[in-house]
């Protein structure tokens, strides 16, 4: 569903949002990412233009794969879900608290404009923070490679 009420496919919607440079967010339930093709699920998420996933909980490997793709995993406080908070997905979201001093597991604010919701940043290690800041593992490796070669 597009903001104007037009019903379309997820893929078509993602293309329109990408064209308008609108980053996307996914609202999810428990154990987000459980399933067999998890690495491709994270790649597909990124390719659709999703910049963050906010879930009640994450499947461990999938959370790591999201980070590896540069997608920010955010977790609702215990017992909270997007449904219990009355979030429909039609809201416009902002994430506050991301900074150069980001710490593993830091609390952030998910804002809908009229509401502020506390979420936990599920970048669980300092290296995951670096991956996220660089746009994922591949970008981190390329930056390190380029940095080393420029020193020579």
List the model feature ranges, each with a label.
Residues 1-152:
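Fe-S-dependent hydro-lyases/dehydratases of central metabolism
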């Amino acid at each position: 569903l597009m903001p104007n009420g037009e019903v379309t496919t997820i893929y078509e919607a993602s293309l329109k949002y990408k064209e308008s440079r609108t980053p996307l967010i996914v609202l999810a339930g428990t154990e987000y990412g459980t399933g067999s093709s998890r690495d491709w699920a994270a790649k597909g998420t990124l390719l659709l233009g999703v910049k963050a996933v906010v879930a009640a909980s994450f499947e461990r490997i999938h959370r790591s794969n999201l980070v590896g793709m540069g997608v920010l995993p955010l977790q609702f406080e215990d017992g909270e879900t997007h449904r219990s908070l009355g979030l429909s997905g039609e809201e416009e979201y902002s994430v506050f608290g991301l900074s150069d001093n980001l710490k593993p597991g830091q609390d952030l604010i998910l804002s809908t404009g009229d509401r502020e919701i506390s979420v936990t940043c599920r970048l669980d290690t300092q290296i995951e923070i670096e991956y996220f800041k660089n746009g994922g593992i591949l970008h981190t490796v390329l930056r390190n490679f380029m940095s080393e070669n420029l020193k020579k």
